[in-house]
């Protein structure tokens, strides 16, 4: 099984999101623990790892998100733990793999890499999201493209409809 993980899951697991309570943080910690038994999908140009690096520590501490980042970084070339896919830059959509769908036209450009790697993976891995409300309004459009967003902290999605 493969999984795509939005950076906010690491941030919440580190306890660095003010609106995330203990239940949300626990869900993120559990999800990262489960991800260690799956294959984490990343891209060969390191768009995802570069973003993780901005929020995670190579020391692997003090938080669970930091520990996960260090673990993933050390295993990025190990096909037992990582599925590395190629995503193609696109001038308008960000990535060619990102759907040309009007319902997704306003989706956050910085999150498009997660959709692109999920589609490039070929097995429709779930995308884990903790706190980013941009995913909520497009969940049905993504579903139409065979993708599922797993909302680890649904309580943070209140009022996210546009």
Regions found by a protein language model. Name each.
Residues 14-16, 51-56, 138-142:
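A short acidic (Asp/Glu
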Residues 44, 119-162:
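Acidic, PIN/NYN-like endoribonuclease modules and their adjacent C-terminal/linker elements
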Residues 1-44:
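Short, well-structured N-terminal submotif of metal-dependent ribonuclease cores
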Residues 27, 31, 104, 138-141:
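Sequence/structural signature of beta-propeller domains
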């Amino acid at each position: 099984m493969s999984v795509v993980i939005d950076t906010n899951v690491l941030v919440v697991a580190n306890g660095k999101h003010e609106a995330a309570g203990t239940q949300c943080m626990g869900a993120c910690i559990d999800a990262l623990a489960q991800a260690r038994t799956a294959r984490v999908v990343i891209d060969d140009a390191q768009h995802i790892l570069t973003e993780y690096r901005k929020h995670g520590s190579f020391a692997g501490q003090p938080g669970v998100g930091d520990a996960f980042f260090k673990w993933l970084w050390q295993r990025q070339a190990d096909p037992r733990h990582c599925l590395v896919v190629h995503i193609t830059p696109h001038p308008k959509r960000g990535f060619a793999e990102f759907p040309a769908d009007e319902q997704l036209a306003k989706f956050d450009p910085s999150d498009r890499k997660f959709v692109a790697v999920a589609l490039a993976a070929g097995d429709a891995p779930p995308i884990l999201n903790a706190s980013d409300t941009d995913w909520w309004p497009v969940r049905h459009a993504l579903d139409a493209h065979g993708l599922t967003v797993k909302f680890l902290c649904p309580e943070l999605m209140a009022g996210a409809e546009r």
